[in-house]
């Protein structure tokens, strides 16, 4: 998870063998894929990469494109994800006989995703897999994709700048800012326990207010007054800190004069 231009796609291309590395090594299941001295060819890594821009072959039908990965690698039927189930989950049954130029960008992206999944690789790399999917359909696809990945048990790395998507799909979440991995943790901790102001500002999921530590369990803010609670870690008395307040932390007090109307509620994982 990180902003555009930070190098997320380059990381995937490097793992897939499409870019060379300068230092270190890339290992998968104890096997060195890349190092300064050696590099296994991309087609021999059993790593599947779905690009952000669809990479469908224009002279093949969508069905042929999807099955190409499995046929190319000579996978047995029982090693692959069920074709019919995958087509149904991604809602692309009506475009199987069409060619890439006859379908929408969102349909092409889903077809590319199906092709990556069908061969059941050791490692699946998804670059902004749902960026071209219509917003009204995206949540449904996210839910289905999560189910597919869970059932297939394929290790998957997903690149996205959508924090909701990252938190919903991922069992772990890495935040990359300024070419550095700023935080790597489960989604709950990344969201509720961000480790820096940089991460908070990037996620944009709350408000930071300045405060002074006045006791082991209290802060003082000039506008809010005294704030009490249990700190995650101890701070010296008199320390200047920033308190993160997120929407979920706020509760309406029935004795308050504040009046409001709930317009919409949406569950996001």
Predicted regions and their residues:
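Walker A (P-loop) phosphate-binding loop of ABC-type ATPase nucleotide-binding domains
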Residues: 3-6
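ABC ATPase nucleotide-binding domain helices that frame the ATP-binding cleft
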Residues: 9-12, 111
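Helix-to-loop junction immediately C-terminal to a conserved catalytic motif
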Residues: 16
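Conserved coupling/switch loops of ABC nucleotide-binding domains, chiefly the family-specific signature
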Residues: 22-25, 178
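ABC ATPase NBD Q-loop/coupling interface
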Residues: 25-45
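ABC ATPase nucleotide-binding domain signature
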Residues: 37, 51-55, 60, 130, ...
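ABC ATPase nucleotide-binding domains
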Residues: 46-48, 61-198
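Glycine/charge-rich catalytic "coupling/switch" loops of P-loop NTPases
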Residues: 223-266
């Amino acid at each position: 998870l990180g902003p555009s231009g930070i190098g997320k796609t380059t990381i995937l291309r490097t793992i897939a063998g499409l870019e060379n590395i300068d230092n270190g090594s890339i290992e998968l299941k104890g096997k060195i894929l890349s190092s300064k001295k050696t590099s296994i060819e991309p087609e021999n890594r059993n790593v599947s990469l779905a690009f952000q821009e669809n990479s469908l072959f224009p002279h093949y039908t969508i069905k042929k494109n999807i099955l190409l990965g499995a046929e190319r690698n000579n996978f047995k039927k029982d090693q692959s994800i069920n074709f019919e189930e995958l087509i149904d989950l991604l809602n692309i049954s009506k475009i199987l006989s069409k060619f890439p130029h006859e379908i929408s960008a969102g349909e092409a992206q889903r077809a590319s995703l199906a092709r990556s999944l069908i061969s059941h690789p050791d490692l699946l790399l998804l670059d902004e897999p749902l960026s071209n999917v219509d917003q009204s359909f995206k949540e449904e696809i996210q839910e289905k994709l999560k189910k597919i990945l869970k059932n297939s048990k394929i290790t998957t790395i997903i690149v996205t700048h959508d924090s909701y998507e990252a938190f919903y799909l991922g069992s772990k979440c890495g935040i990359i800012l300024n070419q550095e991995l700023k935080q790597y943790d489960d989604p709950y901790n990344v969201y509720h326990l961000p480790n820096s102001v940089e991460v908070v500002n990037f996620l944009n999921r709350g408000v930071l207010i300045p405060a002074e530590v006045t006791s082991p369990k209290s802060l003082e803010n000039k506008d809010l007054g005294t704030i009490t609670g249990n700190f995650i870690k101890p701070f010296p008395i008199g320390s200047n800190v920033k308190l993160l307040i997120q929407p979920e932390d706020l509760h309406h007090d029935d004795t308050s004069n504040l009046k409001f109307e709930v317009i919409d509620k949406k569950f996001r994982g």
